[in-house]
């Protein structure tokens, strides 16, 4: 059962997924497919990401595609065809898909170009999003509590609220002051440093910081917003696994196999 059904709420918010990068560090897989379609225990990363959102009633998705984006379109176009028994009537164009459990999801796939940076990809939505929305990356899986993330954002007047986590010391760190991000650090101080976990709530005001295709959300926009005191934080202590390497993928599959993630 959905958490949204248990607690009696539905969140009419879009979830935007950045899915256009080349994923070069995972070239064993990404030479053949975009990274969001790399499979973990029989389902692509993007499926796992969307399932966690759906637990909280988030079912309106916008996928910002780029590298091998046609494969993402084909995945959703054939979503049920590849997951159920099917009967083809070769005398007609008809087909019958059997025993399908419907999903109340709406998925929009937008081509944002192969070499466009993250801020440029997001900037494509400037004229179509007028309310706060969710954003994440198509290569990181987490059981982050979306309701709590949204609530943290709504309690503030911030332009953006990001999810901070404490992984092993391999990522650039955040300098926090209470529930605000002060700045970004290239190298963390060691174990226990907070980093950007890649699950965000954004105000439409973000679009004024996304000037051109080469704008980086992480390097250009978010540090500027932090310097203005408008970048909030929600601290997540649960599961979080980015997938940049084969070993990362193995770690994710090990966690899925335990049955500890709420959507599997």
Where in the sequence are the language-model features?
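Catalytic-core segments of class I nucleotidyltransferases/pyrophosphorylases
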Residues: 14, 133-134, 141-154, 166-169, ...
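Conserved beta-loop-beta/alpha segment of the NTase-like Rossmann-fold superfamily
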Residues: 71-178
